[in-house]
């Protein structure tokens, strides 16, 4: 907490605003109460007085602060939760009246073995209320049953069969307050039924190689879902679409519950793994093809807008605990242009290390659908231990985005965003450090220029 000057984030052009003296601060807390072996209540909160306090004092770069409370019961085959969520949006363009409050969010799940043909059944009941002080309100409830059967054939193929049935009920009002039309849905009551079946086969081949064990696993999946009236219901939790190796084989490649992918598609790909002493390699790749000619609901630029999807994959290499390299990518289906490249490299020990990261997004998603702008960024960080308690550290972030990649960008292709250099001390009960930071962008009173920070923290109090 501090008493200082708070300046407007977007002052009128050409006008110098001095700002107001005010109390500014940030609060963060969390807790957990375990009432019985099954019942517990957890909660966490993050609140700040204004949009730029966290950046101004180098506490956090988060642009959204979430507060939640959750009462839950965890059983051997069941789960029950009643939760509430609130979000404080710190983005410059955010409208406070459009920020959702999720209350209540109720979820119940129960699983059991199916006695006739085998397999596992998962039942789920879920309801959610979304409230806004100046925007669209939405209430949703659904009930679903999902059956999964996994078998290994005599030739070693892993075959998984899935069947899903779900019924949804929605109610919404003030839908016109949602700016993006495809997210609104139709006001009043709307109902939707969902059915899906899938067959997934993976065929692992395992053998010795390079003094270790390698595994090659081709994989193919077929999913079929009848046509759905997706646009009739509001879209609150299925907006941020990102095709990647983690969801290419998912039953529904939309996030959340409000949108469900319909039609018939086949997904194919493979995985590779190699384990030798101190060295581990992992790789995966996949692509899908829609057999249905019906236009897809996925926007252009998401990698799923055409019948053939983009190609997605991941590569990971580890050498003991000393070195790690991870590369996630998405390639254009037509010309293999890199639509997404994300590289993380780390070398060193827990106390002395160097990290390098690179991100390039070239998705060409239209701005009137979602705020997933193209960008390119590089970042680096290093820490060197000096004895058992002292260390020096530094980091840098550089914006590599050009106007060719993003017409709205002001970057020339190499613009530093932030650099940092410091020295720190840490033992069992005390932490302190001195940091010099230079910012190259203005956000309200988080001004560009040099900042010097001295930080002290007492740890393990009461232990």
Model-derived regions: residue spans:
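Outer-membrane beta-barrel proteins and related beta-barrel translocases across Gram-negative bacteria
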Residues: 1-463
């Amino acid at each position: 907490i501090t008493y200082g000057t708070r300046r407007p984030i977007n002052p009128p052009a050409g006008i110098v605003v001095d700002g107001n003296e005010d109390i500014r601060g940030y609060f963060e807390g969390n807790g957990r109460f375990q009432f019985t072996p099954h019942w517990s209540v957890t909660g966490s909160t993050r609140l700040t007085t204004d949009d730029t306090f966290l950046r101004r004092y180098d506490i956090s770069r988060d642009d959204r602060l979430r507060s939640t409370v959750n009462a839950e019961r965890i059983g051997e085959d069941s789960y029950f939760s009643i939760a509430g969520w609130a979000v404080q949006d710190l983005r410059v363009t955010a409208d406070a009246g459009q920020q959702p409050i999720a209350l209540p969010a109720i979820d119940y799940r129960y699983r059991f073995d199916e006695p006739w043909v085998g397999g596992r059944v998962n039942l789920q009941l879920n309801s959610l209320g979304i409230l806004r002080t100046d925007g669209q309100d939405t209430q949703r409830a659904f009930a679903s049953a999902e059956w999964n059967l996994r078998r290994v054939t005599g030739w070693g193929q892993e075959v998984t069969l899935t069947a899903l049935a779900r019924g949804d009920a929605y109610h919404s009002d003030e839908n016109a307050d949602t700016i993006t039309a495809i997210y609104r849905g139709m006001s009043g009551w709307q109902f939707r039924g969902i059915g899906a079946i899938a067959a997934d086969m993976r065929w692992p081949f395992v053998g010795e190689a390079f003094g270790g064990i390698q595994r090659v696993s081709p994989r193919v999946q077929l999913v079929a879902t009848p046509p759905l009236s997706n646009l009739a219901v509001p879209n609150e939790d299925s907006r941020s679409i990102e095709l990647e190796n983690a969801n290419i084989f998912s039953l529904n490649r939309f996030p959340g519950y409000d949108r469900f992918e319909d039609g018939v598609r086949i997904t194919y790909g493979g995985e590779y793994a190699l384990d030798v002493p101190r060295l581990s390699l992992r790789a995966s790749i996949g692509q899908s093809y829609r057999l249905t000619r019906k236009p897809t609901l996925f926007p252009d630029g998401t990698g799923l807008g055409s019948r053939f999807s983009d190609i997605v994959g991941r590569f990971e290499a580890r050498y003991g605990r000393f070195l790690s390299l991870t590369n996630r990518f998405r390639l254009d289906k037509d010309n293999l242009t890199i639509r997404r490249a994300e590289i993380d490299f780390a070398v060193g020990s827990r106390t002395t290390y160097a990290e390098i990261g690179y991100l390039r997004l070239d998705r060409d998603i239209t701005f009137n659908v979602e705020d997933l702008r193209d960008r390119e960024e590089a970042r680096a960080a290093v820490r060197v231990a000096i004895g058992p308690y002292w260390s020096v550290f530094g980091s840098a972030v550089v914006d590599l985005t050009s106007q060719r990649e993003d017409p709205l960008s002001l970057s020339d292709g190499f613009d530093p965003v932030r650099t940092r250099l410091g020295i720190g001390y840490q033992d069992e009960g005390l932490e302190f450090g001195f940091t010099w930071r230079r910012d190259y962008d203005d956000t309200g009173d988080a001004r560009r220029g040099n900042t010097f920070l001295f930080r002290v923290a007492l740890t393990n109090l009461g232990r």
